[in-house]
């Protein structure tokens, strides 16, 4: 599989927000395309997907942090908007941020024991593991998800 040459630029576009989330003490993990990149398969992604704990205090911290990002389109969101339903809340700013409280029917606590971390500045950014990305993407019919699954399987095989 040929990696995308723009992967480093992709990560740096999102780094400021991810560092702000980590510095704010928000309980979250990066998922989907950016997590694939963080796990070692460079490819392009245009958005950030995060899985957050739906604890009320965590959601308040998240919304406070987002109120200082971009044009503050997240200001209209309230903790009550984050229901335990499938799907994401999308915040559109410099790039799209998709916020999930469940992925594949599972909460962040389900994925927590296998979370991995990448260092950005002086903070560690949590992200989903290759095995969990495979779990979430394996039944998808999208070509990019099939490529991600193959890449994550390759990474797991290399890790032994």
Could you describe each region identified by the protein language model?
Residues 1-160:
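Compositionally biased terminal segments of proteins
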């Amino acid at each position: 599989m040929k990696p995308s040459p723009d992967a480093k630029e992709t990560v740096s576009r999102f780094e400021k927000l991810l560092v702000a989330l980590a510095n704010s003490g928000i309980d979250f993990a990066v998922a989907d395309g950016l997590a694939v990149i963080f796990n070692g398969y460079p490819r392009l992604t245009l958005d950030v997907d995060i899985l957050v704990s739906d604890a009320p205090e965590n959601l308040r911290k998240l919304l406070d942090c987002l109120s200082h990002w971009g044009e503050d389109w997240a200001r209209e969101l309230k903790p009550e908007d984050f229901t335990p339903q499938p799907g994401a809340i999308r915040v559109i700013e410099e790039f799209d941020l998709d916020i999930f409280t469940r992925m594949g029917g599972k909460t962040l606590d389900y994925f927590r024991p296998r979370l991995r971390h990448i260092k950005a500045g002086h903070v560690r950014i949590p992200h989903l593991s290759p095995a969990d990305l495979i779990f979430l993407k394996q039944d998808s019919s999208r070509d990019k998800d099939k490529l991600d699954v193959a890449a994550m399987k390759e990474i797991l095989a290399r890790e032994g």
